[in-house]
Amino acid sequence: MGIAVEARKVYPYPFQHVVTSYLNKYPTPLEKHVLSVKTVEEKTDPATGVVYRKRIATCNNVIPSFLRRCSILKVSNVYLEEESWLDMKTRVMTLETHCLTWAQYATMKEESVYKECTENSNWTEFTQKGTITITGAGFLNRVLETFAQTFLSHGVKKSISIMETILRERCGCPFS
């Protein structure tokens, strides 16, 4: 069946500040479940100037312990792969993230875009769509999807809150 979560937020900060804050957001004491983020590839297209990055995030497994009785869920860490394309000329950063840990049982994808806001060039618009489809877990498919939907919805709100806090700390009061 699958679930989807969408979010939109306008940060009242310039694109460069938001992108820099995003790329340096983790690890942070504001989110104890993200243990590390490591850049494994980075290159700039000489023709377009677009910066491509591939990063791997190591996160705590937050699946409730009663569900971890299932052997496939008994892992301490979950690994996410994020690919991003930063185009400073058009002031757009596009990201695609997916889960590496349970790829044979679930498809978890997030597509995010940060771009200069059309209403105010000192602001940055963020949009995100996340989907999760669980397969191969038998009767647990729907239970895990329900947990995932709750977790993703909460995670998006928390991530936005963390960005707002980091932007205030690093950049001061927002632009109007």
From Swiss-Prot:
PRELI/MSF1 domain residues are: 1-175
Listed under GO cellular component are: mitochondrial intermembrane space
Q: Which domain of life is it from?
A: Eukaryota
Q: Which named protein is this? A: PRELI domain-containing protein 2
Taxonomic lineage from the root: Eukaryota, Metazoa, Chordata, Craniata, Vertebrata
